Each structure stands twice: as C-alpha cells, then as structure tokens.
Amino acid sequence: VYIERKRFFVNKVNVKNELLKQINYGFGYGLGNLPRVYQGFVLNRCLKKLNEKCGTSFPGPSPDMSNAVGLCSIITNAIITNKHLIISGHSKKSAGGMGGRKEHVAELSEVKWLPKETKDLWSKKIPFYWTGPTIYSESARLALIRTNSNLVDKINYNYLYAILNIYEKKM
C-alpha cells in the first residue's frame, strides 16, 4: 500500500478575508481558518485585548465560534499548518459526540449549558433551535455586534438556510 506523504506547509491567513468568507457562508460550515483558542494557539495579549473590548474572551453562546469571530477584531493575520499540533476528540455526550450521531439538534430551552440570555438575544433571522449551524451563526452574529463590527449586516442567512435544509435534521 502506498501512502502519499503530504509536504509540510505553513500558510499565512488574512483574517479579514477569512472572516468575510465565513460571513458569506452564514457561519454555517464551522470555523474555517479563523483564529481560535479551540484547537489553536493565541497570544495571551490578544485574548486580553478581546476581553477588554467585550468584557469576555467568548462574546457569544458558542465559545469556539464567538472567540474566533471576536479575535478577528484583534488579529490581522493567522498561521495554519497541515501538521497536527493538537489532537482533539469529544465524548459521547458532548456536542461533537451528538453531531457524530446526527443528534446535534434540540430546542434551545433543552440546552442547559447555553447562557441564560441566549433565547432573549436570538436573531429572528436564525431558526430558533439549537444545532451546529444555528448556534454558530448566532454566536458569530453576537460576537460581531459585541466587537462593534459593521459586518454583522453582511451575514448571508440564505446560505445558512440552504445548509440547514440540506444537512440538518428538521425541528
């Protein structure tokens, strides 16, 4: 058996361009190449700047997406590589485990770990239930608002609706 060895690479990512790409996807596909503390490394001074700006390093209900979008207001460039620096996993009961079983869908009131204000702040443009694409889109929206970004009105909700229609269980 021949296993192709990929060449090691390190690429510089223009954070604003990557953010615009994810905005065009309605934030429904995940984190893309956004900077992040989840499965990534971020300088402490960048996290402190985000905390000063928003009062938290996680300015939305999904910590991974809200942190990634929040960091876009602080960081200009990020670095990605194709070599594994972190090996992540998830338990059966985690959100990732639920996604693997195609059970990553629920009423917002059933998701006990969400911040209490999540339901009250939820956008009318995002379907009102919890699943990967909806919580990511809502978290990104709130992070854009809380970092005073003028890009919040550019979120492509039609793309989000298409993702939900094709890939997600219906509520």
Residue ranges of model-derived segments:
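Catalytic donor-sugar/metal-binding loop of nucleotide-sugar-dependent glycosyltransferases
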Residues: 56-59, 69-87
